[in-house]
Structure formats: C-alpha cells, structure tokens
Swiss-Prot record:
One of its GO terms (cellular component) is plasma membrane. HAMAP family: Lgt. Catalyzes the transfer of the diacylglyceryl group from phosphatidylglycerol to the sulfhydryl group of the N-terminal cysteine of a prolipoprotein, the first step in the formation of mature lipoproteins. One of its GO terms (molecular function) is phosphatidylglycerol-prolipoprotein diacylglyceryl transferase activity. The lineage of its organism: Bacteria, Pseudomonadati, Pseudomonadota, Alphaproteobacteria, Rickettsiales. GO terms for biological process: lipoprotein biosynthetic process. Belongs to the Lgt family. Its main location: membrane. Keywords: Cell inner membrane, Cell membrane, Membrane, Transferase, Transmembrane, Transmembrane helix. It holds the Pfam family LGT. It is an enzyme of class 2 (transferase). This is Phosphatidylglycerol--prolipoprotein diacylglyceryl transferase. It is a multi-pass membrane protein.
Length: 259
C-alpha cells in the first residue's frame, strides 16, 4: 500500500502553523461536547448542560497537560529533561493517551468535588464521547507518519517516510478503527439501547475494559517507541499501562451489577 503523503501542516501564517494534529484536538472537543449534550438531552441524568459547559475548561486543561506530561515522563524523559522548552512544542506531536486519561480523570474529580456532583455520573457521560477524540487523534498520527506498526509482508504493509523504508502495519488506522469507531459504536449501543446510564459506573467500566483490550491487542502490531523498546522482553509500555485500565473497567462493571 502507498502512504498518502499529506502535509502535517494545514496552513501557516508567519510563525503560526495550524497542524492536523492540533485540529484533531479542537474538532474532537467540539464534537464530544455536542454528543455529550445530546446524551444529556435524551436521558436527563444528574448532569446538566450547564455542568458540561463548565466542565469543558477542566477537561481541556486536564487532557492536554496530562497527555503531554505523560508522554514526557513515560516515553522520552531524557530528551525533554535536557531540552525543557521542547515540552511546549505540542504541535510536533507527542501526547500520551494514558496520561491524557489520567489528567482528564483528575480534572473530573476536581470538578465534581467543587460542584458536588457524583464522579461516576460525569464519567459515564464522558465515556461514550472519548472514542471520537481517539479516532481523530489516530488519524492525525497517521497523517504525521508517526506511531507506525511493525514490519510486515502482508498486503496491509505501508512504507512510511520517516521510517526505515520497510513495509509496516498502519497501526494508527487499526487503532482509529477499534479504539475509535468500534468503541464508539459499542458505547452508543449500550447507552441508547440498554440504558446503561441507569447503572452508575457501567459506561465507564465498558470504556476502560474495551479500550484496554483493544490497545493491548493492537500493540502487537505497533512498533514500540524506539527510545523505550520492549519492557520485560516482549511487552510494550502501551500494554503495561493498559492493564490497569482493563482491571479498573472490569471492577466498575462488576460493581454496577451487584448480585
């Protein structure tokens, strides 16, 4: 397969450059907010539209700061500790989903504590929204030619311009499909068909469980970060960080369905 060589920069005006990566965050947040509002309109849970509007600022800060610090601390600390100014260059890419998720969770906790809202009631509404951002983010990774997969002889193999010119799995597209489209469909089905918002923590549990499963599986096709490589001989950082999410998700599902 031929890699569609798309310029990562949409346009630039002097020193200001707008990239597909940055745009994916903006569109993801806007679409997510719109979808969350539709969920609130449909089910009228404890969370109101005003709550969602107030939460946006918390969410944006938590996701961006958490995602960036997660990447800096977990994936490439030596580079950023020697060049701290590079931490601010988010337009170059380099965001950790696990860091962003943790940042978002902390932001949600602080928001709920301030406004006296049930924490899981908020995360249950946010859970069906997150795959939208995951899908757009992975498409942006693909456009950037980063986070590509391992070498393959299959027909899916694609030569990325920033690699060693060997055909590799387009693992960004695998993640966009499973962590984005499939996970979005699962949560939309459970939310609207099975009314899972009625069981506190269930939507959150479904998200964490399926994301963990999908990420652990797709990491088999994804090239480990060169500065880290494999951990414990065969595991990647992404797989290790996804195990707690899988366990947390399973726990929340069980807790939402007490016998």
């Amino acid at each position: 397969m031929t890699f569609p060589n798309i310029n990562p920069i949409i346009f630039s005006i002097g020193p200001l450059a707008i990239s597909w990566y940055s745009l994916s965050y903006v569109i993801g947040i806007l679409l997510g907010w719109f979808y969350a509002n539709k969920i609130v309109e449909k089910f009228k849970p404890q969370i109101t539209k005003k709550n969602l509007e107030d939460f946006i600022t918390y969410a944006v800060i938590g996701i961006i700061v958490g995602g960036r610090l997660g990447f800096v601390l977990l994936y490439n600390p030596s580079r950023y500790f020697s060049n701290p100014i590079d931490i601010l260059k988010t337009y170059e890419g380099g965001m950790s989903f696990h860091g962003g998720a943790l940042g978002g969770i902390i932001a949600a906790y602080l928001f709920c504590r301030k406004y006296k809202i049930n924490f899981l009631s908020l995360t249950d509404i946010i859970a069906p929204v997150v795959p939208i951002g995951l899908f757009l983010g992975r498409i942006a990774n693909f456009i950037n030619g980063e986070l590509y997969g391992r070498i393959t002889n299959s027909s899916f193999g694609m030569i990325f311009p920033n690699s060693d010119l060997m055909p590799r799995h387009p693992s960004q597209l695998y993640e966009a499909f499973f962590e984005g489209l499939v996970l979005f469909s699962i949560l939309a089905y459970t939310t609207f068909k099975h009314k899972t918002l009625k069981k506190c923590g269930l939507n959150s549990g479904i998200f964490f469980t399926f994301y963990g499963l999908f990420r652990i599986t797709i990491e088999i096709f994804r090239e480990p970060d060169i500065q880290i490589g494999f951990i414990l001989d065969s595991l990647t950082m992404g797989q290790i960080l996804s195990v707690p999410m899988l366990l947390l998700g399973s726990y929340l599902i069980c807790q939402s369905n007490p016998k």
